[in-house]
Amino acid sequence: MLAAYLAERLSARLFVPLALALALAASAGDVSLGVLAVDAGFALMLLAQFRSWDDLADRGRDAVSHPDRVIVQAASVAPIVGFSGALAILNICVAIERDGSGIAVSVLTMLIFTLGTWYALRAGRTAAGDHLLLSKYPAIVVVIAGERVLSAPVFILGSALALYFAVFAYEVWHDPASPLSIGGHR
């Protein structure tokens, strides 16, 4: 079930370019292949964690709008819960190991707490809620960058902001159910 879920919801066609964009935004201009590959790998792990959280939180709504999804049809979501929990722990460990400044782990734990609280408390989709969910992408840039944000704040934070606007535009364009969408529900 987990393999089918990952194949369905973590399409390499979408997530590899997104991971590369996140890694480039966090690069501080160092686009050496080794750094880019490690950063993109970390980005993929973070994206998988937060995609699975999004899908777990949306399972009830997806039962109506996307009844064919693996997570909706599954008798138990325990494998996905275990996977996302293990990824959260692994990502925290990677953030600690990669960044001695504490920036990465601080931003990551704040993101985990904020989104976890939002998922637990939200009653439905709102424009503010969708903006909050999209803010995970610039936060992920800072998590990947870690202490590099201290030496190149304009590059990294500017890139993170540009990435936010790109994912916002994508959300407006591709998800007619989003309160942010042109023509979507309000």
Region roles according to the model:
Residues 1-186:
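Multi-pass alpha-helical membrane architecture of UbiA-family
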